[in-house]
């Protein structure tokens, strides 16, 4: 449940998040397994998994929900090989090349035949709603995956006025300044990893790990018109993360000191541990995110 990534969206119009109402709405779009001819299924599951029956998990006004996507695995190479075999056989039999539409029909028949025997791949994506802060957080590795889940939530709720939380000032400009000067806002510290890209279209990319970021070597790249597009940071010795120029937060790691605070809860009481960990994570993110966006120069006005 601890988020590993954080795609941050902000609510840009007035909307009420009612946990009881949302519970009913999510149930209407509950995940059901793929049937024999389904290529994929996408729906909501219990936020606590097998440890809870409710679709939502709520602490104060914060709401956690979870989407599950199941996809049938049909390798393109398998479909292509089957199609080529059938096309060759039919063209030999009829003594003429098949038309494009005939090949497309054959391909659909092959997919229909393979689907019932295809393996499935499933993944879960958590969404955290922070009404007081006006944020919706998606634990996804890309904005594309986050948008897919938010599209499902928008369909579920009927309306979801959110936009990516992108600071007014270009993130890469701020990150470059931090590395160039070696100075970061209070509470933030540079770690030893970064990515720099040339401002020229055909310029190079430098990726460095276990590197002193304020060294002459790194500064020479900045002097040669490269900007920092990814930067590993520490916040108050409680969070480590990699911030990208699109404001996405990856490889989010909560400190052991924080995560160990609930070790007094018996391991067999997993529901209680889940709830306690959720409260800890929410408290941390509720403090961290406003601090981060303030450090990045602030977000534009919601109606801007």
From Swiss-Prot:
Any one GO biological process: DNA recombination
One Pfam short name: RdgC
GO molecular function, one term: double-stranded DNA binding
Subcellular location: Cytoplasm, Nucleoid
Keywords of the record: Cytoplasm, DNA recombination
GO CC list: bacterial nucleoid; cytoplasm
InterPro entries assigned to the protein according to its UniProt record, in alphabetical order: RdgC
Keyword Cytoplasm: yes
Family named by the database record: Belongs to the RdgC family.
Function field: May be involved in recombination.
Name of the protein in question: Recombination-associated protein RdgC
């Amino acid at each position: 449940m601890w988020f590993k990534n954080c795609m941050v969206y902000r609510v840009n119009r007035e909307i009420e998040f009612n946990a009881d109402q949302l519970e009913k709405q999510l149930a209407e779009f509950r995940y059901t397994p793929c049937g024999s001819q389904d290529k994929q299924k996408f729906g909501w599951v219990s936020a606590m998994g097998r440890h809870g029956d409710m679709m939502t998990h709520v602490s104060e006004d914060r709401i956690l929900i979870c989407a599950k996507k199941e996809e049938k695995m049909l390798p393109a190479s398998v479909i292509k090989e089957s199609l080529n075999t059938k096309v060759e056989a039919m063209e030999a039999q009829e003594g003429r090349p098949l038309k494009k539409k005939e090949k497309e029909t054959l391909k659909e028949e092959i997919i229909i035949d393979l689907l019932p025997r295809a393996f499935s791949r499933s993944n879960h994506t958590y969404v955290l709603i922070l009404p007081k802060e006006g944020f919706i957080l998606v634990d996804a590795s890309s904005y594309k995956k986050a948008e897919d889940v938010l599209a499902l939530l928008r369909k579920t709720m009927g309306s979801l006025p959110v936009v990516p939380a992108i600071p007014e000032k270009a993130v890469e400009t701020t990150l470059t300044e931090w590395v160039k000067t070696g100075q970061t806002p209070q509470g933030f510290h540079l770690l030893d990893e970064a990515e720099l890209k040339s401002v020229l279209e055909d310029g190079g990319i430098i990726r460095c790990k276990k590197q002193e970021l304020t060294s002459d070597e790194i500064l020479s790249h900045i002097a040669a018109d490269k900007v920092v597009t990814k930067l590993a940071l520490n916040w108050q010795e409680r969070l480590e993360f990699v911030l990208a120029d699109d404001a996405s937060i990856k490889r989010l790691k909560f400190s052991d000191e924080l995560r160990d605070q609930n070790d007094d809860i018996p391991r067999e009481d997993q529901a209680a541990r889940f709830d306690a960990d959720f409260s800890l994570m929410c408290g941390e993110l509720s403090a961290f995110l406003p601090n981060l966006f303030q450090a990045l120069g602030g977000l534009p006005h919601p109606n801007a």
